[in-house]
Amino acid sequence: MIDLLIIAGPTAVGKTDISIELAEKLNGEIISADSMQIYKYMDIGSAKITKDEMKGIPHHLIDVVKPHEEFNVSSFKVLAEKSIKDIWNRGKLPIIAGGTGLYINSLIYNYDFTDADRDEKYREYLTKLAEDKGKEYVHSLLKDIDEKSYEKLYPNDLKRVVRALEVYKITGKSISEYTKENEKKLYDIPYNVNYFVLNMNREVLYERINKRVDIMMGKGLIEEVKKLESMGYTPDMQSMKGIGYKEVLFYLNGDISLDEAIYLIKKGSRNYAKRQLTWFRKDKRSIWIDKDKYSSEEEIVDEIIKMVKDK
């Protein structure tokens, strides 16, 4: 079984430095789990690690696609699994470092992103049937094949009714049976996972976030966004909707002032950190590291290594 070390946490908590120190001490390589750092040319706004900051530690899944190219959790899972195997086969430890919770979960839970359990044509047929004969009629189709769902779901909950009918058509099983089987598969992964979440005092974290935004502005975030625009990348692209980029675009378009843009970037980043912490708290397998309780990052690194070895 492959050993997998995960260093997660909210934006600006200090995942980068700790993951690099761990990689140095544990002979590891780092796989980024950051939904913005996968984009080329978007360096300042994503707080992308520089070559110097890497300290010679190989980093994977950074600068993977151009800003107009599609990239999602399924894309991440495929590339990350390939990198994990490659790193492990070379006798090194794969270390996942990042704050995109869904990316991390795609690895530590056996999510299936294939379309094996989907039938778009049948779904369209049922939706059209609901328009022609009514939602109650489509709901009644469940009665003979999935009585539990028939009793549980309301006719107005068309999306879930259609999903239950679709699952039965493809698998011959009720949605509850199907879900139960999939839940068992969720934990069937080829990794021995050590999952750590870094945290710190909320006020201190927010101060760090605000300072990071000021640093980004000083490094030339506005110029970076201007360059991206000149390269043909537009506000409707997923990459350009990232925090920092969308606000600067509003400023460049004359919709808001520069001060307002900076305020919104800071606010958006703080709210994002709050959402990240909420996400990570849901996973009972994660071990939380309160950075405030340690006198140095080296102490944190040593504590993580001790916990990994004692497991």
Curated annotation (Swiss-Prot):
<feature type="region of interest" description="Interaction with substrate tRNA">
    <location>
        <begin position="34"/>
        <end position="37"/>
    </location>
</feature>
<dbReference type="InterPro" id="IPR027417">
    <property type="entry name" value="P-loop_NTPase"/>
</dbReference>
<feature type="binding site">
    <location>
        <begin position="9"/>
        <end position="16"/>
    </location>
    <ligand>
        <name>ATP</name>
    </ligand>
</feature>
<keyword id="KW-0547">Nucleotide-binding</keyword>
<feature type="binding site">
    <location>
        <begin position="11"/>
        <end position="16"/>
    </location>
    <ligand>
        <name>substrate</name>
    </ligand>
</feature>
<protein>
    <recommendedName>
        <fullName>tRNA dimethylallyltransferase</fullName>
        <ecNumber>2.5.1.75</ecNumber>
    </recommendedName>
</protein>
<dbReference type="InterPro" id="IPR018022">
    <property type="entry name" value="IPT"/>
</dbReference>
<comment type="subunit">
    <text>Monomer.</text>
</comment>
<dbReference type="GO" id="GO:0052381">
    <property type="term" value="F:tRNA dimethylallyltransferase activity"/>
</dbReference>
<keyword id="KW-0460">Magnesium</keyword>
<keyword id="KW-0808">Transferase</keyword>
<keyword id="KW-0819">tRNA processing</keyword>
<dbReference type="InterPro" id="IPR039657">
    <property type="entry name" value="Dimethylallyltransferase"/>
</dbReference>
<dbReference type="GO" id="GO:0006400">
    <property type="term" value="P:tRNA modification"/>
</dbReference>
<keyword id="KW-0067">ATP-binding</keyword>
<comment type="function">
    <text>Catalyzes the transfer of a dimethylallyl group onto the adenine at position 37 in tRNAs that read codons beginning with uridine, leading to the formation of N6-(dimethylallyl)adenosine (i(6)A).</text>
</comment>
<feature type="site" description="Interaction with substrate tRNA">
    <location>
        <position position="123"/>
    </location>
</feature>
<comment type="similarity">
    <text>Belongs to the IPP transferase family.</text>
</comment>
<dbReference type="GO" id="GO:0005524">
    <property type="term" value="F:ATP binding"/>
</dbReference>
<dbReference type="Pfam" id="PF01715">
    <property type="entry name" value="IPPT"/>
</dbReference>
<feature type="site" description="Interaction with substrate tRNA">
    <location>
        <position position="100"/>
    </location>
</feature>
